[in-house]
Regions:
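Conserved donor nucleotide-binding strand/loop of the catalytic core
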Residues: 49, 60-93
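Acceptor/aglycone-binding surface of glycosyltransferases and processive sugar-polymer synthases
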Residues: 75-77, 81-89, 109-194, 221-230, ...
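Short beta-strand/loop segment that forms part of the nucleotide-sugar
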Residues: 20, 44-55
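Short beta-strand-to-loop acidic/aromatic patch adjacent to the donor-nucleotide binding site
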Residues: 95-106
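Hydrophobic helical membrane-anchoring modules
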Residues: 1-14, 161, 185-252
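N-proximal low-complexity "stem/linker" segments adjacent to membrane-targeting elements
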Residues: 1-35
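Short, acidic, metal-binding catalytic loop of nucleotide-sugar glycosyltransferases
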Residues: 34-45
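A conserved acidic beta->alpha catalytic loop
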Residues: 52-60, 105
């Protein structure tokens, strides 16, 4: 794993780091970088660390040329491991909060203060929900709306008795102190893909941490343009299996 030099943007009451995760997002990561740089002009107290999961399409070159700090995986390991890398960096470098966001231009950096505002109010984990009033899900395919608005929250309710409007957004803020709880094992070998975030959510719920949702945007590209690497059915199962495995005691 190659670590490029990190320079903090400035000091703030909470040390906050934004971590987009990326794999083969050429044509999209450029837009993420532009939006991040615009955001940082008005919010210089935030830091950034991009995690590139060994992209092979030139995304790494774009990130390198951007001047933003980044970590490069030497081999592709999966989105879950990329998130773990971001979390480990945040914890090891004494950040108070990490914001995880997509590297495919579906999330808007300008909405990050909504997440942080609820953290500052005392919450430990804040989810950006596309389905709350004020949120949006432009161009989202119908079947994905059904899955993310109804099926995913139902599974969460079934296994934890907690209700949320959006549990598959991938855009959230979490206190690093939560991530250092010994009951949360970030090194579980079975967590390599999208189930990593579901594992975190399950643990945060069942350990009694304070969770909030805020309106957020999840913007999909126009029809005909590739919008996800997740495969229907198998990808959804990878996301949801963490709740069943943990609830049934099959995994820790």
């Amino acid at each position: 794993m190659a670590l490029k030099k990190m320079e903090e943007m400035s000091a703030s009451a909470l040390r906050i780091i934004i971590s987009p995760v990326c794999y083969n997002e050429k044509g999209k990561i450029e837009k993420v970088i532009v939006r991040l740089k615009e955001f940082l002009k008005s919010k210089p107290g935030f830091s950034v660390m991009i995690v590139d999961d060994c992209s092979t399409d030139g995304s790494g070159d774009v990130i390198n040329e951007s001047g933003l700090p980044y970590i490069l995986h030497e081999n592709q390991q999966g989105v879950g491991v990329a998130i773990r890398t971001a979390i480990e960096y945040a914890c090891n470098n004494n950040f108070d909060v990490i914001v995880i966001m997509a590297g495919n231009n579906k999330d808007l950096p300008i909405e990050i203060p909504r997440l942080i505002g609820r953290i500052e109010e005392g919450n430990d984990f804040v989810i950006g929900s596309r389905f709350l009033p004020g949120g949006s899900y432009d161009n989202t395919p119908f079947y994905r709306v059904i899955a993310t608005r109804y099926i995913h929250p139902w599974v969460v309710w079934l296994t934890t008795s907690k209700r949320f409007t959006d549990t598959a957004t991938g855009f959230h803020a979490i206190r690093t102190s939560v991530l250092q709880n010994p009951e949360i094992n970030l090194e579980e070998e079975w967590l390599e893909d999208y189930d990593y975030e579901m594992y975190l959510l399950y643990k945060v719920i069942t350990l009694g941490y304070k969770i909030a949702e805020v309106p957020a945007s999840k913007i999909y590209p126009p029809r005909g343009i590739s919008y996800t690497k997740m495969k229907p059915i198998t990808g959804w199962w990878k996301m949801l299996r963490a709740f069943f495995f943990l609830r049934l005691g099959l995994k820790k």
